[in-house]
From Swiss-Prot:
One of its GO terms (cellular component) is cytoplasm. Keywords: Actin-binding, Calcium, Cell membrane, Coiled coil, Cytoplasm, Cytoskeleton, Endocytosis, Endosome, Membrane, Metal-binding, Repeat. Component of the PAN1 actin cytoskeleton-regulatory complex required for the internalization of endosomes during actin-coupled endocytosis. The complex links the site of endocytosis to the cell membrane-associated actin cytoskeleton. Mediates uptake of external molecules and vacuolar degradation of plasma membrane proteins. Plays a role in the proper organization of the cell membrane-associated actin cytoskeleton and promotes its destabilization. Residues 344-364 are annotated as: Disordered. The keyword Transcription does not apply. It is found in: Cell membrane; Endosome membrane; Cytoplasm, Cytoskeleton, Actin patch. Ca(2+) binds at D56, D58, D60, C62, E67. It comes from Yarrowia lipolytica (strain CLIB 122 / E 150) (Yeast). This is Actin cytoskeleton-regulatory complex protein END3.
Length: 400
């Protein structure tokens, strides 16, 4: 008999024999594959459905080996009268370590959701939360977020949800449910640990929530694709597809830096934080700045060329929305190109540049954002062309 409150090694080996015997595909079993095993238990359909819901932790409609172990243990506990009924929640001892963070996050998200009909809407209004969330991460914020990440990441450059527990405790205006919600947004694959870019966006959400801005309901398609490491599916009509840097209305001097006390506790300091590595952007007495700016100019010129081609295609196919949006992006690219050309002129003439002008990270972010916009436009144009081709084909068939 299985020990109550523990999965024995022999038990796991037995479940593995059953699991592998069902011939999993991509290390998971579908409902059809598991169905014979479930029905052989002679448990009621209602109980089997509850067991499935508990075991399918990531809600993907399939069971991996860990989830299969949960299923089998619950079935055997019922058959052996170790438990009288299917538990309403998964027992803590039965939660796989790799999925513990997902269980907690799902609890945190489902809990406030169940209260929306009662008082959560009122509570949110009383809190006076704003919806003015800005995805753009300023260089100063990026430095702070990077410091937190570096202090807590493992040797593989990844950080777990629990590793930031001390940080969460310093956030007086961020409830636990919102922390879990932000974590789920940057971690669509429900990994136990996340990488640096995911962590920076996660901290950015917490920063805004601490300042009284609600956690967004979703992430832009370009970010989501990065987090999933998959080919992006952009929707240019979505308001979330825009990733433009915006200036906050509140003066920076009147805002306390995010996690300032936590950074000081780490021995880094909040507002005074600076990277200890070599800052090449401060090298003004060499040819480095000129070389860097020339490279940026080349990248921007290529982006402008891509935007012009997309605009020409849109005009040719008569898509007024795409044409206007392309023109807008083209203007933004040209303005940034003019700005970079002015930087290069100053560098050649020896004129001093401001710290912001020589910040390589900021320039790279701007170029990346513009590249995202151009890519979105190209994908959108392709879709519109497909729609046009389909309509023309339908019209042709009607004329016959």
């Amino acid at each position: 008999m299985s020990a109550q409150g523990k999965l024995e090694e022999w038990e796991i080996n037995k479940y593995w024999d059953i699991f592998s015997g069902l011939k999993p595909v991509n290390n998971v079993l579908t409902g059809d594959q598991v169905s014979p095993v479930l029905k052989n238990s002679n448990l009621s359909e209602d109980k089997l459905a509850k067991i499935w819901d508990l075991a399918d932790v990531d809600s993907d409609g399939c069971l991996d080996f860990e989830e299969f172990c949960i299923t089998m243990r619950l079935i055997f506990d019922l058959l052996n009268n170790n438990i009288n009924d299917v538990p309403s929640t998964l027992p803590q001892w039965l939660v796989p370590q790799s999925k513990a963070h997902l269980i907690e996050a799902n609890k945190a998200i489902s809990q406030p959701h169940s209260k929306l009909d009662d008082s959560d809407d009122e509570d949110l209004e009383n809190l006076g939360l704003s919806t003015d969330f800005d995805w753009y991460i300023s260089p100063a914020d990026r430095d702070s977020y990077s410091a937190i990440f570096t202090a807590n990441c493992d040797r593989h450059g990844r950080v777990s949800y629990d590793a930031l527990t001390e940080l969460y405790q310093t956030l007086s205006r961020v409830p636990e449910g919102d922390i879990a919600m932000a974590w789920n947004l940057v971690n669509p694959k429900s990994d136990e640990r996340i990488e640096k870019e995911q962590c920076l966006v996660f901290l950015h959400m917490l920063n805004y929530r601490e300042k009284g801005v609600r956690i967004p309901r979703g992430v832009p398609a370009s970010l989501r694709a990065t987090f999933e490491k998959a080919t992006p599916e952009f929707s240019i009509n979505s308001s979330q597809a825009e990733l433009k840097p915006q200036k906050s209305n509140a003066p920076a001097s009147k805002k306390e830096a995010f996690a300032n006390g936590y950074l000081q506790k780490l021995g880094i300091g909040g507002n005074s934080y600076s990277t200890s590595g070599t800052d090449f952007s401060a090298t003004k007495d060499t040819d480095w700045e000129e070389v860097r700016l020339k490279r940026e100019l080349t990248d921007l010129e290529n982006l402008v060329e891509k935007a012009e081609r997309a605009a020409a295609d849109s005009k040719q196919h008569g898509n007024s929305y795409s044409t206007s949006h392309t023109a807008l992006i083209k203007r933004e690219l040209e303005q940034l190109l003019d700005y970079k050309e002015e930087q290069l002129r100053k560098a050649k003439s020896g004129a001093p540049a401001s710290v912001g002008e020589t910040n390589l990270k900021e320039s790279e972010e701007e170029v990346n954002l513009l590249e995202m916009q151009v890519n979105e436009l190209e994908v959108h144009q392709q879709r519109k062309q497909q729609e046009l081709d389909q309509l023309e084909a339908e019209l042709a068939s009607l004329r016959k």
